[in-house]
Each structure stands twice: as structure tokens, then as C-alpha cells.
Amino acid sequence: MDAAAELTLLEACWRTVVLGIVQGLTEFLPISSTAHLKVVPVLAGWGDPGVAVTAVIQLGSIAAVIGYFRSDLLQVCRGLARALREGDWGSPDARLGIAIAVGTLPVVVAGLLIKLFWPGYETSPLRSVASIGIVSIVMALLLALAERLGQRRKQLPSVQGLDGVVVGLAQALAIIPGVSRSGSTLTASLLFGWQRSDAARFSFLLGIPAITLAGLVELKGAFAEGSVYGPLPMLLGILSAAVVSWLAIAWLLKFLQTNSTWPFVIYRLVFGVVLLALVLANPTLG
């Protein structure tokens, strides 16, 4: 990555706004925000912004999803509070809260293990352009399989704790760049019979704790001495991610009410093939 001294404030702001737009467009669509936040800067000649910077920009996305689903979250909190008081753990709101809680555990455990035992993760081959291309193709094929085999009967009010475990394990796979958190959770949900729009809704709600924790854990690292981006550029990146994320959430929920996920399957296949072709043409891209 460029040294901090080589960037003017305007250049740093421009880069983080672009990263925020990319983050907002790709966080909630099943196409991998991590992959695009890695690939777009590399193709632009900026270098990999790193895990810390991208995790902090994700805070804009989490602000958007909390704002968008604020009424759902309030209902879940009320359902859990009522369950604690009255023992009514069978209500839809309480069950959804439990599913979100248990579904968050796998990604938290995976993140802690990587933090403790894989200090070189940020520069590992998994973050290479070639690896992201391969993973994107694999995930496209899995989403195609889910779209083909899924029965699409299950709705959000029928969610159980086991759903949280299954989809949460899929979410943990998104630590691998190119997998896509929303893509892996949507794929798992469809395979287990969820309706498309309800699967997306659960994916969004399940992602709130995971994305928030990732952003907070990396917050210190993003502003560490020697970081390319300072507070103002990072703030602009967060704001642009928030606005675009809100629009992406609203669009995807409406889109999946009447459409399939095949456009995302095709996009991910093309994206992966293009990345591999670029690496073959220019091996320095990695």
C-alpha cells in the first residue's frame, strides 16, 4: 500500500468514498464485499487497503442495516425481554433473537482463532486476486445449486435456533475473502427451504452483530500510526457506505420478492473468470 505521506487529504478522501460506495453496493448483495474491496483498489493501483480499513468502513453498512430494521430489532428485544420475564421462549420474536445469538457464535469463534493463531492472515494467499476469483466461482455454483434445489417454503416467523446454527456456520465461512457473508448465508438458507426474501432478511439481521464486532475490533488498527487513511477520510467512507447500503438493502428485498438469485450467480461466475484471466495476463496482480 502507498505510504501515508504520499497521499494528499483529497486523495485519501476520494479513495475512502469509493471504497464506501463499493462496500455499500456489495455488503448486502451476495457478491462479496471483501472481494470487491480487495480487487477494486488493486485494479486502480491503490494496493490492498487491508482488513482494518475495510472493517471500519463496514460500520457504515451496519448503521444502515440497524436503521432499516430498527422496528424488527425492537420487536426481537421485546420478545427476548418477555421471554425472560414470562418464560415464553416459543414466540417468533424470541426465537428469532435466539437464532441471531447462536448464529453469531461461529463467526466470533472463527475470528478469534484467526486473530490469535494466524497473525499473517491479512497478507495470506487467501486474500490474493487469484484466490478470490476461484472462491467466487465456487460460491456461484453453490448458490446456483441452492436456487435449483431449494423448496422456498420457510418464512421468518418459523425460525428456530437450529436455523441460526446452520446459517451461522455458513456465515463463518465468509472469513475467507470472496465467499460473501450475505452470499453464504443466503445460499444456506435457500438450501434449507427458506423463501428468498425471508432468507435475505434473516441474513441481514444475522449480520448485525458480526459486522459490528469486526468493525470495532479493527477500529484501533485502522487509525494506527502509519495508516494511509486518517479520521476524516474514514468518516467519509463510513457515510458513503451507509447511504449506499440502505439503498442496496431496500432494492434487494424488493427484488427477491419476485425474482431469483440467478443474476448474482451469473455475475459471480463472470467476476471470478475475469479475475483469473487478469491474473493470467498480469501475474503481478496476484
Curated annotation (Swiss-Prot):
It is found in: Cell inner membrane. NCBIfam families: PRK00281.2-5 (NF001394), undec_PP_bacA (TIGR00753). This is Undecaprenyl-diphosphatase. Catalyzes the dephosphorylation of undecaprenyl diphosphate (UPP). Confers resistance to bacitracin. It comes from Synechococcus sp. (strain RCC307). Belongs to the UppP family. Bacitracin is thought to be involved in the inhibition of peptidoglycan synthesis by sequestering undecaprenyl diphosphate, thereby reducing the pool of lipid carrier available. The keyword Metal-binding does not apply. It comes from the Bacteria. It is an enzyme of class 3 (hydrolase). Keywords: Antibiotic resistance, Cell inner membrane, Cell membrane, Cell shape, Cell wall biogenesis/degradation, Hydrolase, Membrane, Peptidoglycan synthesis, Transmembrane, Transmembrane helix. Its EC number is 3.6.1.27.
